[in-house]
UniProtKB/Swiss-Prot annotation:
Reported function: Required for the formation of a threonylcarbamoyl group on adenosine at position 37 (t(6)A37) in tRNAs that read codons beginning with adenine. Is involved in the transfer of the threonylcarbamoyl moiety of threonylcarbamoyl-AMP (TC-AMP) to the N6 group of A37, together with TsaE and TsaB. TsaD likely plays a direct catalytic role in this reaction.
Catalysed reaction, written as an equation: L-threonylcarbamoyladenylate + adenosine(37) in tRNA = N(6)-L-threonylcarbamoyladenosine(37) in tRNA + AMP + H(+)
Name this protein carries in UniProt: tRNA N6-adenosine threonylcarbamoyltransferase
Native organism: Neisseria meningitidis serogroup B (strain ATCC BAA-335 / MC58)
Keywords for the protein's UniProt record, in alphabetical order: Acyltransferase, Cytoplasm, Iron, Metal-binding, Transferase, tRNA processing
GO biological process, one term: tRNA threonylcarbamoyladenosine modification
List of residues binding substrate: L134, V135, S136, G137, G138, D167, G180, N279
GO molecular function, one term: N(6)-L-threonylcarbamoyladenine synthase activity
Entry binding sites for Fe cation: H111, H115, D319
GO cellular component: cytoplasm
Species lineage: Bacteria, Pseudomonadati, Pseudomonadota, Betaproteobacteria, Neisseriales
Record-linked InterPro entries: ATPase_NBD, Gcp-like_dom, KAE1/TsaD, TsaD
C-alpha cells in the first residue's frame, strides 16, 4: 500500500510517499525559513499562501522520485493538527480534494504522533515500549509509548517549549531568525562554566519542566555584560560562553527528567524526536545515558544500567512529510472521515482515540 503524506502545520511544506512493503519511497521538503527571516518569525498568512503554491509541485516531484503515478496512491495522510490554522487548512484542503479525486481514503494524522514515530523510519528501530522525549519549538513533552496509538503523557513544559526558549534566547543575543540552530553552533566555541545558569525544576519529584526562568537568567547576564562594557555589543567569546551555558542547562534538565521517567516506568529505551533532537549536545548527552535504581541508605548500590537511545535521521527531526506518511500507513484502515476544513490547531496528543 502506497501512502502519500502531507505536512503543512507551520513553515515547512513536506510531501512523501511511504510503501508498507518497501518503506519510504520519496521525500520532498520546502522550507520557508528565508521568506520569514526578514520578519523575525513565522508570518501565518505568508506561510499558508506558500503551502498552497508548493503542494502540487512537491507531490509531482515525489511521484517522479518514486517512479509512481497518482493512480498508484492507495491513501492520503495529512497533518490535522496541532499547528497554525491557515497552514493546516492548506494541507487539509489539498489532501481531501486529492483523495476525493482519486477515490482513496484520507487519514488525518496528529503532528506530534508523526514526530513520535519518526525514529521508526531509521534502519535501526526501537522496540516498544519506550520513553519518548518530544522536543521542538512548540512542544516539550515526555511520553510513555507502549505501541502505535498507546501514548501516555508523563510530563511537559509548563511554559516555554525548549525549542522556543532556544529561539528567544538567540534573539536576546542578537542572533537572526531562526536563531536556535545558530545558538547551538556558537555554543560549540563556548567555555565550560564561564557562565552558570539555573536548571529550573530539575530536582522536582514530578516530570514537569520550565524554561522561561532560564531565559530570564540569560537576559540578566546579557544586561550585566552590556553595563560592564558600556556598549550594546556583546564580545564574541562572551556570547559563545552564554550560548554554551544556556544549552548545557537545557540539556541537563531534559536528561534529568527523562532519567526519572525511565525509573518511573521501568523502561530502558528512549526515543528523542522533534527539531531540537538534531542538537549535537543533546545527542551526545543522551547517547551516553545510564540510569541507576535508587537503593535504601546503607545498602549496596545497584550497578548503572545502559539505556538504548534512538533518534530519527537528522532529515526527519524537523517537520516533514515522511513522518506523516509513515504514521498514516500505521493507521491504514483505522482512519476516520473528516471534512476538508476540520483541522485542530490546538490538539493534545493525549486526546488521540484510535
Amino acid at each position: 500500500m502506497l501512502v502519500l503524506g502531507i505536512e503543512s502545520s507551520c513553515d515547512e511544506t513536506g510531501v512523501a510517499l511511504y510503501d508498507t512493503e518497501r518503506g519510504l519511497r520519496a521525500h520532498c521538503l520546502h522550507t520557508q525559513m528565508a521568506m520569514h527571516a526578514e520578519y523575525g518569525g513565522v508570518v501565518p498568512e505568508l506561510a499558508s499562501r506558500d503551502h498552497i503554491r508548493r503542494l502540487v509541485p512537491l507531490t509531482e516531484g515525489c511521484l517522479a522520485q518514486a517512479g509512481a503515478s497518482y493512480g498508484d496512491i492507495d491513501a492520503v495522510a495529512f497533518t490535522q493538527g496541532p499547528g497554525l490554522g491557515g497552514a493546516l487548512l492548506a494541507g487539509s484542503s489539498y489532501a481531501n480534494a486529492l483523495a476525493l479525486a482519486l477515490d482513496k481514503p484520507v487519514i488525518p494524522v496528529h503532528h506530534l504522533e508523526g514526530h513520535l514515530l519518526s525514529p521508526l523510519l531509521a534502519e535501526e528501530k526501537p522496540d516498544f515500549p519506550f520513553v519518548a522525549l518530544l522536543v521542538s519549538g512548540g512542544h516539550t513533552q515526555i511520553m510513555a509509548v507502549r505501541g502505535i496509538g498507546d501514548y501516555a503523557l508523563l510530563g511537559e513544559s509548563v511554559d516555554d517549549a525548549a525549542g522556543e526558549a532556544f529561539d528567544k534566547t538567540a534573539k536576546l543575543l542578537g542572533l537572526l531568525y531562526p536563531g536556535g540552530a545558530k545558538l547551538s553552533e556558537l555554543a560549540e566555541s563556548g567555555r565550560f562554566e564561564a557562565f552558570v545558569f539555573p536548571r529550573p525544576m530539575i530536582h522536582s519529584d514530578d516530570l514537569q519542566m520550565s524554561f522561561s526562568g532560564l531565559k530570564t537568567a540569560v537576559l540578566t547576564a546579557v544586561e550585566k555584560v552590556r553595563a560592564e562594557n558600556g556598549a550594546d555589543d556583546i564580545p564574541e567569546q562572551t556570547r559563545n560562553d552564554i550560548c554554551r551555558a544556556f544549552q548545557d542547562a537545557v540539556v541537563d534538565v531534559l536528561a534529568a527528567k527523562v532519567k526519572k521517567a525511565l525509573l518511573q516506568t521501568g523502561f530502558r529505551t528512549v526515543v528523542v524526536a522533534g527539531g531540537v533532537g538534531a542538537n549535537r549536545k543533546l545527542r551526545e548527552t543522551f547517547g551516553n545515558m545510564t540510569v541507576q535504581i535508587p537503593t535504601p541508605k546503607g545498602k549496596p548500590k545497584h550497578p548503572s544500567e545502559k539505556v538504548s537511545v534512538f533518534f530519527p535521521p537528522t532529515a526527519y527531526c524537523t517537520d516533514n512529510g515522511a513522518m506523516i506518511a509513515f504514521a498514516g500507513a500505521m493507521h491504514l484502515g483505522k482512519g476516520r472521515e473528516v471534512g476538508a476544513f476540520n483541522v485542530r490547531p490546538r490538539w493534545p496528543l493525549s486526546e488521540i482515540v484510535r
